[in-house]
Amino acid sequence: WPESNDEPKLQGFAGYKVGMTHVIMIDDTKNSLTEGSEISVPVTVIETPAIRVAAIRAYGEDTYGEKAIGEAWTNVLDSDLDRRIKAPKNHDVNAALAKIEGLVEDGTVTDIRLITYTLPSSLTGVPKKVPDIMETGVSGADAKAKFEYAKNVLGTMVDVSDVFGNGGIIDVAAITTGHGTQGPVKRWGINLMKNKHSRQGSLRQVGTLGPWTPAHVSWRVPQMGQMGYHQRTEYNKRILKISSDADEINPAGGFTNYGLVRGNYILIKGSVPGPSKRLIRLREPTRSKVSSIGEPQIVHISTQSKQG
């Protein structure tokens, strides 16, 4: 998680991809040829229902590096969480908090993080009930302040508006769309065999696997194999809008392969990995010089049917 000296708050969130549309906005890019003019921008819609903070996890360091040294689980857990993990039973949350507080006081704790999970059962467009559970960082440099914040939000629901704001810069991580096993032409974009070579039984294959010596096929040679369904992170995406008014974005007939948005959502400039209904993880940027460019001025959001 990125280092931050801001006030303690969650550094990440999660949502489910809905689809794409486009908006008309005022170009606020400095020195752009269209600065101050209306431009059309493609956006991705991500539905972001509130997530619950399930536990506090404290980290300490020894000669082998950083490791977890204490956890405190809330007693306020949703029944759907049992579909994912076996939550601790007969857990004394007060004793666990007291233990972590003591470790914070003596300087043993180096970092405080939160265990959060989503509630996809509240979404009509995502056909699953099993929550997605994840560890989320907390901003701030003081472990004591981070622990006090963690105690306040333990067991509560956190909205996306409590974490990010309009115009903010974020990183997104997701599993890309899977294409199964594909050949080297589609997978790597190599050229087809030409002329006489194409009539000798190898039209969509690589010309050579390498030299005779060394007698080894390099990993650089484009070959067939799995294409897609990989975890990928894309950096420095801009949030254009955070809202709960779904009527502003729902197109006629709903989004393809998803349906209607009914709760909180965000609009991200450009595309994000993965198909609709897939989990999209959001976090504060790790490679950005600024955390926000400023709130964008959106003139129009397209609600034209996406059915074709």
Regions found by a protein language model. Give the residues of each.
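Extended basic (Lys/Arg/His-rich) segments that typically form rRNA-contacting surfaces
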Residues: W1-T177, T181, K186-G308
